[in-house]
Amino acid sequence: MTLSFVTRWRDELPETYTALSPTPLNNARLIWHNTELANTLSIPSSLFKNGAGVWGGEALLPGMSPLAQVYSGHQFGVWAGQLGDGRGILLGEQLLADGTTMDWHLKGAGLTPYSRMGDGRAVLRSTIRESLASEAMHYLGIPTTRALSIVTSDSPVYRETAEPGAMLMRVAPSHLRFGHFEHFYYRRESEKVRQLADFAIRHYWSHLEDDEDKYRLWFSDVVARTASLIAQWQTVGFAHGVMNTDNMSLLGLTLDYGPFGFLDDYEPGFICNHSDHQGRYSFDNQPAVALWNLQRLAQTLSPFVAVDALNEALDSYQQVLLTHYGQRMRQKLGFMTEQKEDNALLNELFSLMARERSDYTRTFRMLSLTEQHSAASPLRDEFIDRAAFDDWFARYRGRLQQDEVSDSERQQLMQSVNPALVLRNWLAQRAIEAAEKGDMMELHRLHEALRNPFSDRDDDYVSRPPDWGKRLEVSCSS
């Protein structure tokens, strides 16, 4: 089958990019590809059998028209000016059978005009982390970019130490970022901001294109998508680590996996990025930061959208987030209905978990085994203060009995939303260290395991992290 590519971005937004081709690595070789995703995208298996090829930037497929995008943004709350694709190149937009498109974005593809002081490269460590994280999030049901392939090489790339140069093929319906809009707003080119909005509506919100109120309705949906995404992050214990405006997806996708981390111990103020000295992007601050980022996006639209309309959309953010968060947390607790005491029970559980540094994922998974008429719980042994747990658990069982559903029905629901497996940093690190020594088996095993996060397991993928794996420091270097 021949793949078809379109050039919408190149043709319709000519001032938002520089056309250029990838710069190949030395002795590049494909070490992993996403068979399931490739099948979904109707990519012929033969493309993965002919060396690095397109996956390593050594060849282009017919119809591809590679380019690096320019955007700007606020980083750690401070205006950073022009940024852009410093190491990534959008190879093309694949046209799918249903008429939608999928960006092919090659990360680590070499120098671009937007590399600033960087070398345009990515290292094997960061490409493995992003591939694992994006696929883990996808199978958790959270909107995200996807990973299609990883190529490693003999080209050294210098970060804290010399590391193998690598490339990741990332795919997504769009790479539109808040930062695209900021770039032209701060250049006082509001008509180009409008062109970006029109492009987004035309291709991703086409049902609004002929509505005279399209900009308000579109921005309201961007707010809703962002609120829903952040709510989902919070329910699975995911910390992004670097929520700069240029890393915010207009479509509400999880974008740009860098120093991310899933909670091990329940620590509301968890900081996964060791460069985040002030804790701006801590786990519990993510909802507020996302709203701040939306406010920056709204500012770029103010030349052609009424400020009252923008503020009305922004005002809806908190309620949308709380609604999505509340619904999912009730499911995680096994509540089939909404009762007034639900929030208190959840907050008391969080207080217990925070005091005892309980494992976030394991706590909710073990809670899924609760039998409402039995005071016994395997979760009890996870707490030192048994009296406090017993008090909470008795009230929790009483609440379960209000819903009048069977244990098996409730447990099935809880186990479908409380994963047994999340991508803990130590699991990723173990796969990285093996891969850097030439052993790709753990990378493939972990990818396969992450496809079934809600299935019971009895291996170390679902255990507490070992001592060496706790609080691994992760930086932005990639």
Curated annotation (Swiss-Prot):
Protein name, per record:
Protein nucleotidyltransferase YdiU
Report the sequence similarity comment from the record. Answer: Belongs to the SELO family.
Q: Which HAMAP family match?
A: YdiU_SelO
Q: 4Fe-4S: is it a keyword of this entry? A: no
Q: What is its EC number?
A: 2.7.7.-, 2.7.7.108
Active site annotated at which positions? D246 (proton acceptor)
Q: Which residues bind ATP?
A: G84, G86, R87, K107, D119, G120, R170, R177, D256
Provide the residue positions that the database annotates as binding Mg(2+): N247, D256
Q: What does this protein do?
A: Nucleotidyltransferase involved in the post-translational modification of proteins. It can catalyze the addition of adenosine monophosphate (AMP) or uridine monophosphate (UMP) to a protein, resulting in modifications known as AMPylation and UMPylation.
Under the heading Pfam families, the entry gives: SelO
> What is the enzyme's class at the highest EC level?
transferase
Gene name, Swiss-Prot/TrEMBL: ydiU
Essential cofactor(s): Mg(2+); Mn(2+)
Q: Keywords on this record?
A: ATP-binding, Magnesium, Manganese, Metal-binding, Nucleotide-binding, Nucleotidyltransferase, Transferase
Molecular function terms, GO-annotated: AMPylase activity; ATP binding; magnesium ion binding
| Spans traversing the lipid bilayer | none
Q: Catalyzes what?
A: L-seryl-[protein] + ATP = 3-O-(5'-adenylyl)-L-seryl-[protein] + diphosphate; L-threonyl-[protein] + ATP = 3-O-(5'-adenylyl)-L-threonyl-[protein] + diphosphate; L-tyrosyl-[protein] + ATP = O-(5'-adenylyl)-L-tyrosyl-[protein] + diphosphate; L-histidyl-[protein] + UTP = N(tele)-(5'-uridylyl)-L-histidyl-[protein] + diphosphate
